[in-house]
Amino acid sequence: MADLEEQLSDEEKVRIAAKFIIHAPPGEFNEVFNDVRLLLNNDNLLREGAAHAFAQYNLDQFTPVKIEGYEDQVLITEHGDVGNGKFLDPKNRICFKFDHLRKEATDPRPYEAENAIESWRTSVETALRAYVKEHYPNGVCTVYGKKIDGQQTIIACIESHQFQAKNFWNGRWRSEWKFTITPSTAQVVGILKIQVHYYEDGNVQLVSHKDIQDSLTVSNEVQTAKEFIKIVETAENEYQTAISENYQTMSDTTFKALRRQLPVTRTKIDWNKILSYKIGKEMQNA
């Protein structure tokens, strides 16, 4: 191991550390960071070299953050990145600094929104918040209105998590939806992601995603928002149901096939009488 450490450059060490951090399971960033910190044994190198990994992790995970003085949480996503470590809260029309390591928001300041699309964004946000409140008890959503390639586009992001470290599991739901405001009909594109880590008596991760495409009738802001939420609700319900059914089937069939119910001898071992067995005597003599 010592020879391997001598062969690795600082750049290679940081690259490996960054990969560990980016792939940290939901709710376990601090644990992975602390482990990597011990392995690297160079705080300055870690902070400077792996800073991009801290940021990438928060962007990928849709990390929610509370801004002092404001009621609702906002998600850290690539769509809200306005540069120089600042992010947008479109609901409150502010931008703020975000510390990717401490996961803290500071210095909120007014920020001009895309006024031409704000009424559409607000309508979708109102409808989406009601949907998230009903379906995700711990859910957070952020809705952006942006011009992309000259087209007015709505981007809706949802995050919900359950961190149960005492019970040895953590999980996170993420979904991202986009549609462009065009006459008559718009294409809706979505991606749904589930990540769960269970680590009691083993180490198992569920990582799943699904791409969605649908069409949306565009009329006025309020009606379009209602139709959009119907698409979101149907797709997310179907995905979650399919995941549950799939893993129930695997539990009933696939997992059971991975092990014998009895040893090859077709006889269970009585561990209280292990010393009377030949293997017990061999262990005693060892």
Curated annotation (Swiss-Prot):
Residue numbers of N-acetylalanine PTMs: 2
One Pfam assignment: F-actin_cap_A
Lineage: Eukaryota, Metazoa, Chordata, Craniata, Vertebrata
Gene Ontology CC terms, in alphabetical order: cortical cytoskeleton; F-actin capping protein complex
Keywords: Acetylation, Actin capping, Actin-binding, Phosphoprotein
Record family assignment: Belongs to the F-actin-capping protein alpha subunit family.
Gene symbol of the encoding locus: CAPZA2
PANTHER family for the chain: F-ACTIN-CAPPING PROTEIN SUBUNIT ALPHA, F-ACTIN-CAPPING PROTEIN SUBUNIT ALPHA-2
Residues with Phosphoserine modification: 9
UniProt GO molecular function: actin filament binding
Protein role: F-actin-capping proteins bind in a Ca(2+)-independent manner to the fast growing ends of actin filaments (barbed end) thereby blocking the exchange of subunits at these ends. Unlike other capping proteins (such as gelsolin and severin), these proteins do not sever actin filaments.
Subunit structure: Component of the F-actin capping complex, composed of a heterodimer of an alpha and a beta subunit. Component of the WASH complex, composed of F-actin-capping protein subunit alpha (CAPZA1, CAPZA2 or CAPZA3), F-actin-capping protein subunit beta (CAPZB), WASHC1, WASHC2, WASHC3, WASHC4 and WASHC5. Interacts with RCSD1/CAPZIP.
The name this protein goes by in its record: F-actin-capping protein subunit alpha-2
A Gene Ontology BP annotation from the UniProt entry: actin cytoskeleton organization
